[in-house]
Amino acid sequence: MEIPNPPTSKCITYWKRKVKSEYMRLRQLKRLQANMGAKALYVANFAKVQEKTQILNEEWKKLRVQPVQSMKPVCGHPFLKKCTIESIFPGFASQHMLMRSLNTVALVPIMYSWSPLQQNFMVEDETVLCNIPYMGDEVKEEDETFIEELINNYDGKVHGEEEMIPGSVLISDAVFLELVDALNQYSDEEEEGHNDTSDGKQDDSKEDLPVTRKRKRHAIEGNKKSSKKQFPNDMIFSAIASMFPENGVPDDMKERYRELTEMSDPNALPPQCTPNIDGPNAKSVQREQSLHSFHTLFCRRCFKYDCFLHPFHATPNVYKRKNKEIKIEPEPCGTDCFLLLEGAKEYAMLHNPRSKCSGRRRRRHHIVSASCSNASASAVAETKEGDSDRDTGNDWASSSSEANSRCQTPTKQKASPAPPQLCVVEAPSEPVEWTGAEESLFRVFHGTYFNNFCSIARLLGTKTCKQVFQFAVKESLILKLPTDELMNPSQKKKRKHRLWAAHCRKIQLKKDNSSTQVYNYQPCDHPDRPCDSTCPCIMTQNFCEKFCQCNPDCQNRFPGCRCKTQCNTKQCPCYLAVRECDPDLCLTCGASEHWDCKVVSCKNCSIQRGLKKHLLLAPSDVAGWGTFIKESVQKNEFISEYCGELISQDEADRRGKVYDKYMSSFLFNLNNDFVVDATRKGNKIRFANHSVNPNCYAKVVMVNGDHRIGIFAKRAIQAGEELFLDYRYSQADALKYVGIERETDVL
């Protein structure tokens, strides 16, 4: 009689039952382990408390209780009551005192906890309701209806109730591994059952085979199975995905299992991971691999690593900066300088911007190479220098550090063959050992400094510039030049400032006439075509900023201002466009100067410099807490920035319903995409109350590509005054929220 085979792997229903049973078993096991751990901790802590209590009791027994000296009875007063103070200790005598009542102390206004911030902090949307809001001890019918509507806004997802909803459980990594391994055992047993059945049939049909051979074959197969762990069947991941759809598709789960099992090895490095350059296992790798983590985590808009304000980092800036910062010095830096080698100084001077001469004169060039002999080192070649050489011949030698700091990938380079009739020579190289870390650092520095070997040697610190020069020749990097299209862009024609101002006014008027909607700025990335109707900046009616990858001559790119005054009138293009002066664009108004002091000629750069006033927090005369200013300010002067969490409009709608129920909201619209919420995180300006006659006003300003909310003085404010804003309530909300001020106005 044949034993019935278990369900095959094709039966998805069988695997679903197994997934459910194993998951329930693992959950029960986790709960049991958690309970046992909690009990063990409770017993251990209770024993420590008992031990400490016993020690304190022994110490207190050694102390003698001394009674307090009794006070003399006070003479009677006709308006004060007399009270008697008795003690439970026998050593203390009763005392008779006159009872004096204290004056009423005003209660401190209610304040909910919040975290201080000095700049906006972007957070993700909360798709699960973290807790049911508390609406008071008395539950009303309208409160129950509100809670039901609130849960529906989160699609019925409440923290702690995920297990009640089928398929909404997010499995942790540890439980996921245990679940797959447990299901994999059923798969192994199933295959073993099939193999045993087939082997039994084959053994019955082949009785002539000796028993020893069959045992040997089974032993070999068993050793192979035990030595190599089989990867789980695809049906297992499909069953888990069908039971828990919130965890992803089967392919995602398979990749997740593979990553978790590979990470179990403590000595194994993550994929595409380069060893620490300062460690003993440093390797010699290319520049792209060395800078991969820096380019991935670095934000080129705020110049920070792992930025919390820009989730989508700007693409690399491939355009070169005009001003040169790094130049090759024509004189040797020391006795071991590479410029002392024969022909090296002429080569360095060839690419030095200071050695340029005007006119069409002929010049002798000496290029160092390994293909020519020492005798030919003094050979010269005459090359004709044209007008194009005057413009682009030496730009690449003095590269800018900023051009590479904003570049996500290293500057593209191409191997430039040696010009004809140029003879080069290489000095006899000394055997110098280079470690993997030094070679990797050289490749990183060479992408920025190119053939400035003196600067590279100073940065390395372990090699002379002569040794660096010889290694560069060996690496064949000495003739690698940046691509012409990146390092030699077309010359930009000069335009008069009045044309740029007219251009800015035209776009601003277009924005004012079309709509009042403000959209979040995202840099455009289409370097091969101009900005047209498909450009995201044009579509959102934003200017192209310095972070965009369009052509520098783009008509939509904001040019900055050329003001000589304070930039606080509409004559300034930046002020007209409701944006602060950019220190990289506005070079004459003072926005790019005096960063170490608060006194600056430009008055349109206060938010980015953080030139806020000193604010005080105290109980308000209107409602709750209020914000007071410590120093006097003039009209239209910057007071503070309204900071908080940067959330989406959908998240603001969900939070706003709860805030409206509490009759306290700190939401502030930033643009059509984001809202600033200062409820959980913010600064002291969040306590500024509403008034129909405010002394401050808020304005959304574009600051270096980011919309930020600035609070400015609407009139001259004296020190110690409370700050008020116009929340722009509707007529019904104004009667509900500002009753104190309304009664004051009537009186």
UniProtKB/Swiss-Prot annotation:
Protein family: Belongs to the class V-like SAM-binding methyltransferase superfamily. Histone-lysine methyltransferase family. EZ subfamily.
SUPFAM superfamilies: SET domain (SSF82199)
Root EC class: transferase
Coiled-coil zones: none
Official protein name in the record: Histone-lysine N-methyltransferase EZH1
GO annotation terms (biological process): heterochromatin formation; methylation
UniProt catalytic activity: L-lysyl(27)-[histone H3] + 3 S-adenosyl-L-methionine = N(6),N(6),N(6)-trimethyl-L-lysyl(27)-[histone H3] + 3 S-adenosyl-L-homocysteine + 3 H(+)
Keyword Ligase in annotation: no
Lineage of source species: Eukaryota, Metazoa, Chordata, Craniata, Vertebrata
Organism per entry: Pongo abelii (Sumatran orangutan)
Region: Disordered, residue numbers: 188-231, 378-421
Subcellular location: Nucleus
GO cellular component, one term: ESC/E(Z) complex
Quaternary data: Component of the PRC2/EED-EZH1 complex, which includes EED, EZH1, SUZ12, RBBP4 and AEBP2. The PRC2/EED-EZH1 is less abundant than the PRC2/EED-EZH2 complex, has weak methyltransferase activity and compacts chromatin in the absence of the methyltransferase cofactor S-adenosyl-L-methionine (SAM). Interacts with EZHIP; the interaction blocks EZH1 methyltransferase activity.
Biased composition (Polar residues): 395-414
Domain SET: 613-728
Signal peptide limits: none
Entries under InterPro entries matching the protein: CXC_dom, EZH1/2-like, EZH1/2_MCSS, EZH1/EZH2, EZH1_SET, PRC2_HTH_1, Pre-SET_CXC, SANT/Myb
Domain spans labelled CXC: 504-606
Key words of the record: Chromatin regulator, Isopeptide bond, Methyltransferase, Nucleus, Repressor, S-adenosyl-L-methionine, Transcription, Transcription regulation, Transferase, Ubl conjugation
Pfam families associated with the record: Ezh2_MCSS (PF21358), EZH2_WD-Binding (PF11616), PRC2_HTH_1 (PF18118), preSET_CXC (PF18264), SET (PF00856)
Gene Ontology molecular-function annotations: chromatin binding; histone H3K27 trimethyltransferase activity
Cross-link (Glycyl lysine isopeptide (Lys-Gly) (interchain with G-Cter in SUMO2)): 327
Motif extent (Nuclear localization signal): 491-496
Assigned EC number: 2.1.1.356
